[in-house]
Regions:
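Acidic/aromatic-lined carbohydrate-recognition and catalytic surfaces
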Residues: 1-168, 172, 176, 189-242
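Short, solvent-exposed loop/turn segments at secondary-structure junctions
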Residues: 9-11, 47-48, 92-93, 180, ...
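A structural motif
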Residues: 37, 179, 187, 322-323
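Hydrophobic residues within beta-strands of alpha/beta enzymes
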Residues: 40, 182-184, 326
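Core domains of carbohydrate- and sulfate-ester-processing enzymes
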Residues: 103-145, 263-281, 348-373
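Active-site regions of oxyanion-processing enzymes, predominantly non-cytosolic
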Residues: 174-175, 180-184
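Extended substrate-binding grooves/exosites of carbohydrate-active enzymes
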Residues: 201-230, 235-236, 240-270, 339-359
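Loop/helix patches that line or flank the sugar-binding groove of alpha-linked glycan CAZymes
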Residues: 219-223, 246, 273-275, 279-285, ...
């Protein structure tokens, strides 16, 4: 199984308004097949006032820029007809400050006032979140509310059973529309507060209990249809913490994998890779999801600038266990730098054509990193026999021939400075992989390796 993250606005435009949409995605199934995609993750497609969509106004409707609910259903049907599953990004921790629930809460209306978290007189309103020292309490019209992701995204109160039930209703609605599952955004933030003291504090026990409940509901809905649910969680934390959430949800993005390989390629030496494999890719009760990057990170090609090194990254990605995910355009070498206050540079329009002009090409924003005729387009990559895209297509074919890798694990890891070797097995099948990340030849365990080579025995 291979996953593919799509930022809807940037991928494929079906009506020439410059904005990617559901029908554009449906029209792209031939491309998905070429790169071996089995499951697509859509970033938020709901009604939202922002370009990124993570602050939601209505969980039960689509962003009209992307199409109607009927267009969404048509896209789902087309993907399913071509053997491709769909998971949707679901931010359940917070809503937009323009959401009807929050507007009613600000007016003091019941039951909506109890959907949110309000400051008490003894709270320290200068309390900040851990990772960047931003305030978590926000004052408006004489009321102070909790919003760990900013004042425009007030947190929901999951100590209120009504809020929990609303979240389960949202899951059921989209599962009944045909989605195969979810990417659960900010999973450790459902309970990230001490309600008695007004402090920012993760409660992993309560979070995991909630996700067990959510997955029980999702499986129940799918069971009535004779189908399975696929869900993946975002928990950016130590592997030991990730394990707890992943066990509940079934699959989790492996941030350490992405960080370790990027750092190793930048600075030389495989020690981070070895540590990552030992801590995250052993035998688990869940599937890890190793990935090239996402919308919250610098683009792969902006960190690993040599195409040969990016080919090594994809070799590592495709020979390790679980469900590998490709961030749209990473298979082409798209570039982009992430800024926490301005993430548009990592979500530029997907370049179908060398000229950035043609049927299906999105153009909702001016490009900064991926300009015309710079080599990172489908058209240009397909014209080269040695391109990164062609390499990814080859790895996709390998993955299709070895579907057992989804449920495998890594063992017997050995290494020198620039080479790592590892065995991948599911107990019945197995491969031995040798990877040289250096720009010079290496010989390890009697195996001769060319520069930047991934060899399977």
């Amino acid at each position: 199984m291979i996953g593919y993250e799509i930022f809807v606005r940037s991928f494929a435009d079906s009506n020439e308004d410059g904005i990617g949409d559901f029908i554009g995605i449906a029209n792209s199934v031939d491309y998905f097949k070429k790169i071996g995609v089995d499951v697509i993750w859509l970033t938020p497609h709901f009604k939202s006032p922002s370009y990124h969509g993570y602050d939601i106004i209505d969980y039960f409707d689509t962003n009209p820029s992307f199409g109607t609910v009927n267009d969404f259903k048509s896209m789902v049907d087309t993907l399913h007809a071509n053997g491709i599953k769909l998971v949707i990004d679901l931010p359940l921790n917070h809503v937009s400050d323009r959401h009807p629930w929050f507007k009613a809460a600000m007016r003091g209306e019941k039951p909506y006032e109890d959907y949110f978290l309000w400051a008490q007189p003894h709270f320290n309103l200068k309390e900040k979140r851990h990772w960047d020292e931003e305030f978590i309490w926000h004052e408006r019209n004489g009321k102070t509310y909790y919003g760990v992701f900013g004042g425009s995204s007030p947190d929901l109160n999951y100590d209120n059973p009504q809020v929990v039930q609303k979240s389960l209703d949202i899951l059921e609605f989209w599962l009944n529309l045909g989605v195969d599952g979810f990417r659960f955004d900010a999973a450790k933030h459902i309970y990230d507060y001490d309600i008695k003291e007004g402090r920012f504090r993760y409660d992993h026990d309560k979070n995991v209990n909630y996700w067990n409940l959510a997955m029980e509901k999702a499986r129940e809905v799918k069971r009535t249809k004779g189908e399975d649910v696929f869900a993946v969680t975002e928990v950016w934390d130590d592997p030991e913490i990730v394990d707890r959430y992943a066990t509940a949800i079934g699959c989790s993005f492996n941030f350490y994998f992405t960080e370790a390989i990027r750092e190793s390629m930048q600075h030389g030496g495989v020690y981070k890779i070895v540590d990552c494999f030992q801590r995250t890719l052993g035998k688990k009760s869940y599937k890890p999801s190793n990935f090239t990057g996402n919308h919250d990170m610098n683009r792969l090609a902006s960190i690993i600038t040599k195409e040969d090194e990016r080919k090594v990254f994809f070799g590592l990605l495709m020979t390790t266990p679980g469900v590998p995910f490709i961030y749209y355009g990473d298979e082409l070498g798209m570039r982009g730098a992430y800024d926490s206050t301005f993430s548009e540079d990592v979500i530029e329009p997907f370049p179908w054509y060398a000229s950035l002009s043609g049927d299906g090409q999105a153009f909702w924003k001016a490009v900064r990193f991926n300009r015309a005729f710079t080599g990172a387009s489908v058209e240009e990559q397909m014209s080269r026999s040695d391109s990164l895209l062609k390499e990814v297509m080859n790895w996709a074919a390998f993955r299709k021939e070895n579907e057992w890798l989804t449920n495998a694990w890594v063992e017997n890891i050995t290494h020198n400075t620039f080479t790592v070797a590892y065995t991948v097995t599911d107990g019945k099948n197995g491969i031995r992989v040798y990877v040289n990340i250096a720009g010079h030849g290496e010989t390890f365990e009697g195996i001769a390796l060319k520069p930047y080579q991934v060899k399977i025995l």
